[in-house]
């Protein structure tokens, strides 16, 4: 039985949305047990509306929440915050992994202090899975855990992501690109130039050189490494572009009776494309580099987004990904 701690507090839509996602997800997985972390009264009220089999969950009560407007200093001030207790469950090996939709800065800071980083990792990075045109997934990191990074950080991200792609996504020869403003080797700031040089020297990864933001959704590269500042901008630009494009297509094909009639022929195709590039189906990001399986969902996550993050968390647990990454970093097998 796999056990996941779910911080159901702190996200924009409240605990009811998180618990509804938990209720739906656990019905699909007989091998899963959930620890719902948060305000006990609030959780019990939500469970009355969206019940879960009592043999498949327990409540871990907390008295505090670090909301989206909270300070990173709250990780010291609010010792009984749900996000703190959830990470402590991972540290104490009471659960196999965790997820939260709460405050990102608090999550990153608390994970650093409570769990610590793996061997030679100075800064952990957020890594989401991005859908692409080739019906595969592109890994992009860091997407905002850090505002500044070193070349060594980016090289470590490439190593860890390569292990993740091999073990979880089952591709032993993933291509790795460095996000830059052009594909030429001479492009970029000193960070990109030094990172390029170090990645080029690694013999056991498939480094293909510099790539651009437009390559994220094409499927021409499997893993893209970048600093957290650029990565966050890239991620949100891709999510926004996909959302606007799908909205405009829907608006256009429903703008007249004739277009509506014609669109019926392609309705299934439109739905397939919309589902492929809907970020809510890939809403989670793992905090890669800490000593535990820790996932962050969007603060604005709805039921579908939380279920997607639960699925990613369970996949990472089943593949024992943190131990494999730790072993790979120590033995230089990535």
UniProtKB/Swiss-Prot annotation:
Pathway(s) of this molecule: Lipid metabolism; phospholipid metabolism
Name this protein carries in UniProt: Phosphate acyltransferase
Protein EC: 2.3.1.274
HAMAP family reported in the protein's UniProt record: PlsX
Localization, UniProt: Cytoplasm
Sequence similarity: Belongs to the PlsX family.
GO-annotated biological processes: fatty acid biosynthetic process; phospholipid biosynthetic process
InterPro entries the UniProt entry points to: FA_synthesis, Phospholipid_synth_PlsX-like
Function of the protein: Catalyzes the reversible formation of acyl-phosphate (acyl-PO(4)) from acyl-[acyl-carrier-protein] (acyl-ACP). This enzyme utilizes acyl-ACP as fatty acyl donor, but not acyl-CoA.
Chief site of localization: cytoplasm
Cellular component GO terms, alphabetical: cytoplasm
The entry's keywords: Cytoplasm, Lipid biosynthesis, Lipid metabolism, Phospholipid biosynthesis, Phospholipid metabolism, Transferase
